[in-house]
Amino acid sequence: MDSPHIPVLLKPVLNSFKDIKNGTILDCTLGYGGHSEAILISNPNLKIIACDRDSESLSFCKAKFEKYSDRIKIYKSNFAGILNKIDHEDIRGILADIGVSSLQLDLDERGFSINSNNLDMRMDKNQTFSAKELINSYSKDQLADIFYKYAELPNAKSLAQKIVDARDKSPIKSAKELSSIIGRSNLKNRSVSIAILAFQAIRIEVNKELDELNNLLNLIKSSKINNAILDIISFHSLEDKIAKSTFKEWEKSCICDNFVMKCECGNNHSIGKILTKKPITPSEDEIKQNPRSSCAKMRIFHIQRNV
């Protein structure tokens, strides 16, 4: 069954797991199964535990992976919650692709696109809070805060005021209407339109994407997972910063304060090693085949605890 979504950085993902002879790979963001399918094909001794919040993609994948039913288990869960449901002992690889699928972007009813007639942006359709509720209920200051924090828009306050003024006349009901209020011009030195950046900020807030990533990383650190490769694929600078800074902290053996002259912590706190000093990015060929992959970055960490 062909996937309606092209998995990003597929070759680097497979390469990162190539030395894993057997065991289980945890796919924290199954989507339409592109990465998981390639992993299963690459090594018949590997199994997959996968999860996603999107009911539509889960239905697709349950049919897609029927022939691999003895090698893959699929759960409806966010990627932080899945760690509470599984045995950590056999996990040898973890993949988290922190992005929206092409199908989610393209389906009008999902309301992710600036041209959509809907205004939704929920990755989990069972979630009650959507972009429509956010846009029509957040205060001016709350809107400005997410535009500045998640999209780094210098005109965040004036943008928030535009939205408040418009909804005071009539509730904002569609993404198309919202994007016309925001405007589609580009900021100076930015190739992406203001509307796309603002929509990205709204999506991050609706789905609590940064919280989800932080929760996942915290749970991995406190878990019993060991001798495993962790791949984090991000599409936003804030997500990449979280992965980068977390991996740096995990690699530290000494966690004493900087002013301490002599180590007092035992110098044994490292839980592994960073395998990518710089993030892996898509090749020119991949970007040509899938332009949406252009801003993807992947960082890899080898979890190796002192036990």
Curated annotation (Swiss-Prot):
Gene3D superfamilies: Putative methyltransferase TM0872, insert domain, Vaccinia Virus protein VP39. InterPro entries: RsmH, SAM-dep_MeTrfase_MraW_recog, SAM-dependent_MTases_sf. S-adenosyl-L-methionine binds at G33, G34, H35, D52, L83, D97, Q104. Its main location: cytoplasm. Keywords: Cytoplasm, Methyltransferase, rRNA processing, S-adenosyl-L-methionine, Transferase. Its EC number is 2.1.1.199. One of its GO terms (molecular function) is rRNA (cytosine-N4-)-methyltransferase activity. Disulfide bonds: none annotated. It comes from the Bacteria. GO terms for cellular component: cytoplasm. It catalyses: cytidine(1402) in 16S rRNA + S-adenosyl-L-methionine = N(4)-methylcytidine(1402) in 16S rRNA + S-adenosyl-L-homocysteine + H(+). It is found in: Cytoplasm. Pfam families: Methyltransf_5 (PF01795). GO terms for biological process: rRNA base methylation. Specifically methylates the N4 position of cytidine in position 1402 (C1402) of 16S rRNA. Belongs to the methyltransferase superfamily. RsmH family. PANTHER family: 12S RRNA N4-METHYLCYTIDINE METHYLTRANSFERASE, S-ADENOSYL-METHYLTRANSFERASE MRAW. HAMAP family: 16SrRNA_methyltr_H (MF_01007). This is Ribosomal RNA small subunit methyltransferase H. It comes from Campylobacter fetus subsp. fetus (strain 82-40).
